[in-house]
Amino acid sequence: LFPYTTLFRSRAEVADVANAIYDGTDAIMLSGETAAGKYPVDALKMMADIAEMTEPHLDYKVFIEHRSMDGREKISSAVALATVRTAKNLKANAIVTPTMSGNTARLISNFRPKVPIYAITPNSTIQHKLQLIWGVTPLKGYQRDTTDHIMSQAMNVVRSRHLIHKGDLVVFTAGDPATNMTNGRGAVTNMMHVIEAE
């Protein structure tokens, strides 16, 4: 985003970074020229400072009220939106989602919940990709199994890392392996549970 020949930033460059944040971008990055230029560390620090100064001014209600649901994935998007609204209404401590593809965590992130999103996946590649998604903490764990076992395994992962504690309210969402194939379109996120951590 920044030119590499000067330490000073123009108003347009600052606005580009701020607008990316206002647009809900999950990650921003420097161009190759900047990263290899005279001041790569200073440019990165400046970009991070702009992002950190911009984020507190976002109206997160806008993300819930005005983000449209993905047309290809209306069922999953509707469940993701319901998950975020439920977490807000109940003042939940976290959202937990076991995921094979990372899609559920990405959909939930689109609505910018104020609670952490813990995405539990057995797939290392998906875990690494989810590190770039806003608000998502990807964790390794769980194996394909019945819905009850997947929920139990995912809760054990977040509990063992002390991310949730006894009495915390957790909104749990995933695709139920027994019922999540819809009209030949593949797996969808189709369930949500509210659980009090034991």
Task: Identify the role of each PLM range.
Residues L1-F2, T6-L7:
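Short, small-residue-biased leader/transition segments that mark boundaries at the very start
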Residues V17-P40:
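Glycine-rich phosphate-binding active-site loops on the catalytic face of alpha/beta enzymes
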Residues A20, I108, V170:
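Conserved, mostly hydrophobic/aromatic
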Residues Y22-A27, A48-Y60, V84, K88-A92, ...:
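Generic secondary-structure signature for well-ordered alpha-helical cores
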Residues T34-P56, R185-I195:
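C-terminal helical cap(s) of enzyme catalytic domains, especially alpha/beta-barrels
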Residues M46-V84, M191:
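Long, charged amphipathic helices and adjacent flexible linkers at domain junctions
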Residues T104-R106, R112-H149:
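Nucleotide-binding motor/catalytic cores of P-loop/tubulin-like NTPases across gene-expression machines
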Residues T137-K140, S152, N156, A178-M181, ...:
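Beta-strand/loop-dominated core regions that host nucleotide or nucleotide-derived cofactor-binding catalytic loops
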